[in-house]
């Protein structure tokens, strides 16, 4: 074999090897399996005070704190008490635990659907007063003690504080516990469990 022939064969072999390596590189990157990342589910749309208020005004629902429900103890009337009680299954008659927000941000009970009496603060509604919650004849101004504004809590986008419109530093508070009247208390931190409320619409 001449030297020239040997060089030609060597060059051909090198070119074939380079072509093979190029093909393998292409195949590896073209057809390698890329694992599909697990789905985290649809994104949660952050609630806003406006969206919460709209939901409360759109229909009846329960107002809950740590699995217990705001409850009218009897047919609403002047000074009728409102307590935090164990939630009743919606398949049963839980009208005493169903609420709706009026156009001026007051809460009425399904036991009084015409809205004669509203959820009210018994007392001056001053910060730190620990005034109890009860029913009183509805007023027309949303700046009264009967007006409430939801405030989003950063630690849980589904829960919120209910701030009293007369004194915007006081919130609806369930700290007295089960079968007791909630109170108006100074709004605490976002992690204050007794002030974490959620409105759950009742399907008609």
Swiss-Prot record:
GO terms for cellular component: membrane
Top-level taxon of the source organism: Viruses
Keyword Lipid biosynthesis: no
Native organism taxonomy: Viruses, Varidnaviria, Bamfordvirae, Nucleocytoviricota, Megaviricetes
One Gene Ontology term of the molecular function aspect: carbohydrate binding
Coiled-coil ranges from the UniProt annotation: none
Ranges of residues in domain Ricin B-type lectin: 52-200
Matching PROSITE patterns: RICIN_B_LECTIN
Location (main, coarse): membrane
Disulfides per UniProt: 69-87, 118-138, 171-187
Keywords: Disulfide bond, Glycoprotein, Lectin, Membrane, Transmembrane, Transmembrane helix
UniProt xrefs under InterPro entries: Ricin_B-like_lectins, Ricin_B_lectin
Membrane-spanning parts: 6-26
Carbohydrate attachment residues: 79, 94, 104, 114, 165, 190
Membrane topology summary: Single-pass membrane protein
Compartments it resides in: Membrane
Name this protein carries in UniProt: Putative B-type lectin protein L288
């Amino acid at each position: 074999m001449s030297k020239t022939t040997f060089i030609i064969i060597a060059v051909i072999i090198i070119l074939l090897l380079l072509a093979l390596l190029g093909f393998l590189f292409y195949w590896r990157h073209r057809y390698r399996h890329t694992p599909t990342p697990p789905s985290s589910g649809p994104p949660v749309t952050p609630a806003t005070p406006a969206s919460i208020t709209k939901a409360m005004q759109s229909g009846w629902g329960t107002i809950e704190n740590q699995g217990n429900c705001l409850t009218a103890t009897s047919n609403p009337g002047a000074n009728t008490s409102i307590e935090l009680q164990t939630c009743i299954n919606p398949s049963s008659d839980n009208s005493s635990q169903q609420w709706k927000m009026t156009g001026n941000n007051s809460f009425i009970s399904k036991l009084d659907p015409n809205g004669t009496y509203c959820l009210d603060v018994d007392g001056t509604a001053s910060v730190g007063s620990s005034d109890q919650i009860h029913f009183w004849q509805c007023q027309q101004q949303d700046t009264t003690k009967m007006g409430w504004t939801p405030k989003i809590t950063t630690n849980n986008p589904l829960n919120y504080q209910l701030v009293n419109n007369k004194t915007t530093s006081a919130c609806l508070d369930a700290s007295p516990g089960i079968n007791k009247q909630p109170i108006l208390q100074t709004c605490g931190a976002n992690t204050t469990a007794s002030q974490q409320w959620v409105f759950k619409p009742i399907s008609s």
